């Protein structure tokens, strides 16, 4: 246990989401898909254009590049150089996954000659944060979608037992005491209190930092990569100039659709 972990005290035990949230995940994700189809054209009109810098999108636990293909196409149309993670289904940090991710990041930086923005859903967001922690000079910013990096995450996650079966805790290659600390790059955590897979309290920053922000949206966990509110947020965050990062500020209609914004 690290000194910072000792200072915070024992790991809190946070319960998983309620049965109601878990059982309605699929139905609510379907609503998000329908909302996306209805708002897709408007999204393309109001989303800020990109500057061509590279972006890598990482899938959540048990997901693959197909799961976030629609989001990647949207960002490509905004003029970003978008890439998937290219490693099939995300089963956790096993079989050298983190080493391959490091190589993937280095390759993209060499190919484009610029730092990469990382967008990660759930477990993919945790991987993104750890890459940025290890290679801050190669990562422009991190955007996590419902990623349980906070303390108490193992008790607060419905698929925790399956994850632990595939990735025994004693074999995890990442220091678990550091996960809740933000990496030294601009970092945005997008979360929903309606998350039916992981408890929302583990998906946002506990403490304020100069370059971190947590933004609350309405939606499910499984539908985050197909949520039009999140698509707009990701586009807005990616469009912020690298040397001029600023927190997201709600204005007008955004105050209704994004109910919580805090450091």
At which residue positions do the language-model features occur?
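Flexible, membrane-associating and regulatory peripheral segments of lipid-active enzymes
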Residues: 1-56, 68, 73, 78, ...
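Sparse, context-dependent recognition of short Cys/His-centered cofactor- or disulfide-binding micro-motifs
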Residues: 18-23, 28, 40, 46, ...
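Histidine (H) residue identity feature
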Residues: 27, 44, 53, 83, ...
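Residues that form generic nucleotide/phosphate-binding pockets
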Residues: 33, 104, 233, 237
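Short beta->alpha connector loops
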Residues: 36, 62-63, 196
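Serine-dependent carboxylesterase/thioesterase catalytic core
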Residues: 53-66, 70, 74-185, 190
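Helical cap/lid subdomain of alpha/beta-hydrolase-fold lipid enzymes
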Residues: 133-134, 139-263
């Amino acid at each position: 246990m690290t000194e910072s972990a000792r200072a915070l005290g024992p790991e809190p035990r946070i319960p998983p989401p309620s049965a109601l949230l878990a059982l309605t995940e699929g139905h609510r994700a379907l609503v998000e898909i329908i909302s996306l189809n209805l708002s897709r054209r408007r999204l393309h009109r109001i989303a800020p254009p990109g500057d061509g810098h590279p972006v890598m999108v990482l899938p959540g636990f048990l997901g693959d590049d197909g799961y976030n293909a629609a989001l990647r196409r949207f960002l490509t149309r905004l003029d970003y150089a978008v890439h998937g993670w290219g490693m099939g289904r995300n089963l956790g940090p096993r079989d050298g996954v983190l080493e391959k991710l490091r190589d993937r990041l280095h390759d993209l930086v060499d190919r484009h000659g610029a730092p990469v923005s990382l967008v990660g859903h759930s477990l993919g967001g945790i991987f993104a944060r750890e890459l940025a922690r290890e290679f801050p000079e190669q990562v422009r910013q991190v955007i996590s979608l419902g990623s349980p990096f906070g303390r108490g995450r193992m008790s607060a996650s419905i698929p925790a037992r399956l994850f632990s079966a595939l990735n025994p805790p004693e074999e995890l290659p990442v220091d678990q005491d550091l996960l809740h600390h933000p990496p030294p790059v601009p970092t945005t955590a997008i979360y929903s209190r309606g998350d039916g897979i992981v408890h929302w309290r583990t998906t946002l920053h506990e403490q304020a930092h100069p370059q971190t922000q947590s933004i609350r949206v309405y939606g499910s966990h499984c539908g985050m990569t197909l949520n039009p509110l999140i698509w707009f947020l990701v586009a807005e965050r990616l469009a912020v100039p690298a040397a001029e990062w600023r927190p997201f500020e709600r204005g007008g209609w955004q105050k209704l659709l994004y109910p919580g914004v805090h450091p």
